[in-house]
Amino acid sequence: MTSNGPTSVKSDRVGAVRRLANRKFRNQVQRFLVEGPQGVREAVAHRPEVIDEIFVVGESDVSDAATEAGVRVTQVPEQVLLAMCETVHPQGIAAVCRFLDFHTPNDPRLVVVLHDVRDPGNAGTILRTADAAGADAVYLTGDSVDPYNGKVVRSTAGSLFHIPFTQTDLDDVLAMDLQILATSGTAARDLQDIDLTKPTVWLFGNEAHGLPELEVESVAIPIFGSAESLNLASAAAVCLYASAFAQRG
């Protein structure tokens, strides 16, 4: 169903959507905002049941698909959509979605843990990479960024609608009966020396300080050129795809 929405940037509905940029308000209402066609397209294709409402300027293939899926679509002027969104260019569409339920995967083979990862761009990119590598779940522990932070959501490019993720305690993750690995530049063993065919939890830490002292196996990513190291998102991509290739033989 398509209807006409608010025409004033000062309307209560616009203000309520804009407040989703605030973490406390998001948690209170259990809602978050998806901005741009890619994220909204993935929500419509994979989790239409969590979409409360799509706001759109003009016509789009995404809004047509949403209407076919029974999702509420509301037409708004461009200035109203801009007032709702954090980004300067939301590309004419945004969606209010309910928080996603998390179901613990059965017999997981590849799990990603982000501990104290503060940068939303890194968190979103790693979640997207985990999705691409076929990981079973992503856990955010410690003081990691809120997964419903707007920049995290945008950085996932819709992958948060594909892969289960949740916030939990690190101890719960460490209790998993899987091989647990963490990267370290001073580790005694390199990535290629590890049996990655085993079901594995990859643990990635804070961008500046790494991980706390943990009783898990440390693995070094070999540097063949002159770079000092890889950034967090790049290191995660190397590790996750190494596991994905090994597990798929």
Task: Report residues per predicted region.
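Short, polar loop motifs at secondary-structure junctions
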Residues: P37, V57-V62, F99, L170, ...
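Structured adenosyl-cofactor binding patch, chiefly the S-adenosyl-L-methionine
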Residues: A95, T129-A133, S144-F161, E213-G249
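RNA substrate-binding interface of SAM-dependent RNA methyltransferases
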Residues: V96-A187
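Arg/Lys-rich RNA-binding interfaces used to dock onto structured RNA substrates
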Residues: M1-P120, D143, A244
